Amino acid sequence: MLRGQQIWLSNLTQPQTSAGPVPAVESPPALCSTSLPQVCLDPASPALLPKPTWTLSWSRPGSCVMPGAAAASLLSPRTLRLESPRGAGLSLMRPRPFPLICCCSTCSGPPPSTFLATRIRSQPSILSTPGSFPPSGPIWPPPPGGMLPIAALRMYVS
């Protein structure tokens, strides 16, 4: 479906120096950009919690691919590779903290009110938000003409 497509998220680019890439810096809370593709994370069901997977969906403004569909591959030294069929897995393309900008204003279905810790390459992956969402999760659906705030997720892998 979407497998093999190349999607470039400007939020994920990092400056280069002669000493190598500069570690990415977590973005502050902000409004969603309708000009960028969006990667959405949906809460996994309890049956998925022990597994090293997330339920993922991927969307462009105005459309949404529901969980279980093939996710796009983001293939670059500075980007993530998202893989799906039936309970998506996520693999990190470089072994250092890396932010993923998650914005669900155009996704159908429930919002990612809970970000699940999981394991990638047998190492703990810790997801955190910069306070974009209230404890009860974001308002869903978004108010007419409104956008949900971005949640910057930082993933730690060895």
From Swiss-Prot:
Signals that turn on the gene: Endoplasmic reticulum stress conditions initiate the internal translation of ORF4 driven by an internal ribosome entry site-like (IRESl) element.
Function: Acts by interacting with multiple viral and host proteins to enhance the activity of viral RNA-dependent RNA polymerase.
Other remarks on this protein: This ORF is only found in HEV genotype 1.
Protein name: Protein ORF4
Species per Swiss-Prot/TrEMBL record: Hepatitis E virus genotype 1 (isolate Human/Pakistan/Sar-55) (HEV-1)
High-level lineage: Viruses, Riboviria, Orthornavirae, Kitrinoviricota, Alsuviricetes
